[in-house]
Regions:
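Carbohydrate-interacting regions of secretory-pathway proteins
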Residues: 11-208
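Bacterial N-terminal signal peptides
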Residues: 1-7
Length: 208
């Protein structure tokens, strides 16, 4: 099997020749070198965003939201997975608010919200992550990397943390949308924190 790496619009797309599924491809959304395909989101009171010496993306603590959103080529809106590693280094609220596309709308995966330990997806049937069935408590330690994977299909959202399934939610026929407010500026794909410093790396998308 031959592995080819092709640069497309600043993204690196890795394809395996001979694969049974030609749609299987991995898009490196953040390569640790530049943010050419990203734009800082104009949140009020936002913190600084930069790449540190280790090639990790740092979203520094702001008054409330700090983050950036995708401005590169169009990404799939269903049948894909996003994987990343994230950690909280300062603060007590969410260190990874991952806004992602779903068909004609968007939603946000929250890690560490509402005081630092809530996970969930905002919003389902107009209920945010603290109010719908995806909301749960998860203890995050500061300065510890967590492996995160989000799978989006037409019928289901699934989330794993460190290989363990923590959210498995049927969404077909339901109202999927974003919590009203500034976070709506994170579309089509965005990452943000709330009054917290978050560090991320190895951000990838894979079509399924």
């Amino acid at each position: 099997m031959t592995v080819l790496s092709i640069s497309v619009g600043g993204c690196v797309v890795t394809k395996q020749s001979g694969s049974k599924k030609s749609m299987d491809s991995e898009i490196i959304l953040f390569d640790g070198k530049n943010l050419d395909n990203w734009q800082p989101t104009d949140f009020a009171g936002k913190g600084e965003i930069f790449i540190d010496k280790n090639g990790s993306l740092v979203l520094e603590m702001g008054a409330e939201l700090s983050g950036l959103h995708w401005k590169g080529e169009a990404l799939p809106t269903s049948n894909y997975e996003i994987s990343l590693q994230a950690k909280r280094t300062m603060g007590s609220d969410f260190f990874c608010g991952l806004t992602f596309p779903y068909k004609e709308t968007h939603a946000t995966l929250i890690l560490g919200g509402w005081g630092g330990s809530l996970i969930g997806i905002s919003s389902l049937d107009d209920f945010d992550a603290s109010e719908n069935e995806t909301g749960d408590a998860y203890i995050f330690e500061d300065n510890q990397w967590y492996d995160v994977r989000l799978k989006v299909t037409d019928s289901e959202f699934t989330v794993w943390i460190d290989g363990k399934s923590v959210i498995d939610c049927e969404v077909e026929g339901r109202r999927v949308g974003m919590r009203p407010g500034e976070i709506e500026m994170s579309v089509p794909l965005g990452i943000c924190t709330f009054a917290t410093t978050g560090v991320l790396k190895n951000i990838k998308l894979r079509k399924i």
